[in-house]
Amino acid sequence: MSLQEILLENTKKAIAQHYGQQIENIEIQLTRKEFEGDYTIVLFPLLKFIKAKPEQIGEVLGAYLTEHVAEVTAYNVVKGFLNLTIADSYFLSFFGEIAAQERYGTTPITAESPAMIVEYSSPNTNKPLHLGHIRNNLLGFSMAKILEATGKRVYKTQIINDRGIHICKSMIAWQLFGKGETPESTGLKGDKLVGKYYVLFDKAYKEEIAQLIAEGKSKEVAEREAPIFVKAQEMLRLWEQGDADTLALWKQMNQWVYDGFEVTYRNLGVSFDRNYYESETYLLGKDIVQRGLEQGVFYRKEDGSVWIDLTADGLDEKLVLRSDGTSVYITQDLGTATKRIEEDFPKVEGMIYTVGNEQDYHFKVLFLILQKLGFAWAKNLYHLSYGMVELPNGKMKSREGTVVDADDLMEEMVQVAEELSQELGKLDGYTQQQKQQLYRVIGLGALKYYILKVDPKKKIAFNPQESIDFQGNTGPFIQYTYARIQSILRKAGELPMLPTSGDLHPKERELIKQLSLFASVVQQAADTYSPALIANYVYELVKEFNSFYQNVSILGEEDPAKRSLRIHLSRKVGEVIATGFDLLGIEVPERM
């Protein structure tokens, strides 16, 4: 039982004994820096149940805990806070337990571990990945790692939107303007080549619309009758009919895109266990609609279309099958979800969809329908919704070719890291290859940390220069502290024995207290689907270590026991930084 749990149980006993109340929710937190103490019990919420002043309640609880909990050596009450001082022996004992633990703060996966699916990325195959995809991929991949760290088996998936009019636009533009261009002949990544033709389609389409309007057509008619758009629609019809030439071109251009995506994913450091393709799933779900009709969950209108009425649940009526029997997006999503969980991964308990907040309503509807259809796992579905990412100069559109390209942004981050590192001039003795690797670790670490430190639901204004600062709440600042710790450990040589008794310096206590929070932060990040909690915890730990580093001597300490403890503390902080950053998909350099 942890000290927090011991304090919690004894506080409940004290309240029951003195006030005759059973209170479950008692808030215990680390004592704020300006107060004396280690742990604080917040008294204000207790006033709802106990008719007494907070100071009186604090005195009663403080006296009880000092008497009944050996680790509590003193207490003080400041307004609505009971601050408890904990014995050095407890902190030394606790640190002794975690010092030897590998991957402290995480839970190993076993044969009995529950399983989850995490879906992320899910791009269209008509253009390269952009800045928005970077946030999506980083969130999904990090959540998968965090869930694994809490003992869950995780399957990482994406559904690639590889069919529809948007693909046909790139295909028809390539036929009209491409002159047989390939990634090999142009030296362009395949996704960039296909994206180039998506932009060319849009340019030609706008020119044709303008021409038709000039000839006297209305804007609406011009948009519908523009020859290049008519050709794209005809291509979609041929694809749906299984025309061999159309399918061959579709497969060829999609493969170019997949090859390009693979390079981007590899550079970003994300991966998948299973890919799904919309061309293989878009017919799924019709059997689910039939089942829903039989159950009375869905109803058929006079025109033959199938609907569900969700007005009693505060939502609208929702179409689930068109009158001509063709599916809509929700139909496919119903089919794909049941295929994944009932067939492909039958031991899975739930699924997380990493999708932007513009789809919030869609997922409310999807999850509610699956619950009404009686799927037990539907209650374990979660939409990891996130806000838009913008650059300082505003948002981006892909049809006009002004999108912030993911590959270009990653390269820019590496370039900025190189320029800054050369300014600092601390790379003597590095080979050129080592330097390039370090620039990549710093640049991508800066990008990932800047995005993941923000709560997913908030918008991000991404500033490359700000993200790569070596001071403040940034990836490079944390990486630099990690490298500093590794330097200390190299100079220390063989690890000395860890002392089990002695007095602690206040900075040592603070560091151990900060380390003690890590396991609960990992669990909380999993429970709330927020990698930001881990990012900001690691930053707080690093700030605490730097304060420790500036206020005490580590290698220069003459007392062997104190020197030993400080080396072990440094080592453990380094390990927790590395573990925390690993959960965010960020590398840490041994030297900087």
Question: For each predicted feature, which ranges?
Answer:
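Short, charged, solvent-exposed linker or helix-capping segments at domain edges/interfaces
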Residues: 93-99
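Flexible, low-complexity linker/hinge segments
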Residues: 100-111
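Non-catalytic interaction-recognition regions
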Residues: 1-92, 110-592
